[in-house]
Design a protein with these regions (language model features):
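Extracellular/periplasmic carbohydrate-active domains that bind, remodel
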Residues: 1-251
Length: 251
């Protein structure tokens, strides 16, 4: 299915296979005004889309709102996202907690994020994975993303957690996440977070390649960084418990 050239309020994709949205604009103002949501679908492509939303701009969830199953093979490219509150990109919080769903193979490329203004710490992160409901989130790539001024919020969050307001179980884990060529220019954002839940529900394998904060390229051997400082401090980012294999490099 191809949807081309429409201007919509919200436009969710649920229980679908093989959907392309091209040249679509999503503009919303009410509460819960998410833009382009994906529920329990696969092989979904967003190309040349614009989102100006009063809640999350785009999401990738598993079972939710009467749609049941895994979510995989979702790509968004050549996009502009602007969230009033909540997240420009949000992944992972909803699924079937009894069965345990999988959200995998997500790719976000060549995206401009114009802002985030979210005062609630647990819902910050322009690039956010909040894994709940016994979901497993894996193989996620954020590539060539430019973030402008953040009014309130952080650059990223990658968490396995148990948000009892919206979930009935913690997530199973997050694996293999790549942040490549991410650029932020503005005043210092709030603290980014990478954090697992337990020894059985970890964050594993988070790679940062070519990250620039206000023009400074961050990597583990960058000039001027004391050897005892964590590279994550320069985002700034807190790396918490139950996190394995996190590293910064030059692509």
């Amino acid at each position: 299915m191809l949807i081309d050239g429409l201007t919509v309020n919200t436009c969710p994709v649920g229980a679908s296979d093989g959907v392309t949205l091209r040249n679509v604009k999503s503009i919303s103002h009410p509460g819960w005004g998410d833009g382009l949501n994906v529920f329990a679908s696969q092989n979904v492509l967003y190309d040349r889309v614009f989102c100006r939303n009063s809640d999350d701009c785009t999401t990738a969830y598993a079972s939710r709102k009467g749609f049941f199953g895994n979510c995989r093979n979702v790509t968004m490219r050549n996009a502009t996202l602007w969230a009033d509150v909540a997240h420009p990109i949000f992944i992972g919080i909803h699924g079937n907690a009894e069965r345990g769903d999988t959200i995998e193979n997500l790719h976000y490329e060549n995206i401009d994020i114009l802002g985030q203004a979210e005062p609630q710490v647990d819902y910050q992160g322009c690039l956010a994975i909040n894994c709940g409901d016994n979901n497993l989130v894996r193989n996620v790539t954020f590539d060539n993303i430019r973030i402008e001024q953040i009014e309130q919020g952080s650059i990223l969050q990658v968490k396995v957690g148990y948000n009892q307001k919206y979930c009935t179980a913690p997530g199973r884990g997050v694996e293999n996440v790549t942040f490549r060529n991410i650029r932020y220019k503005g005043h210092q954002p709030y603290l980014s977070i990478v954090n697992g839940y337990s020894e059985e529900r970890k964050v594993k394998g988070v790679t940062f390649e070519g990250i620039k904060i206000n023009g400074r390229l961050l990597h583990d051997k960058m000039e001027g960084k004391p050897a005892w400082y964590a590279t994550a401090d320069y985002i700034p980012m807190y790396v918490g418990n139950h996190v394995e294999n996190i590293g910064f490099s030059i692509p």
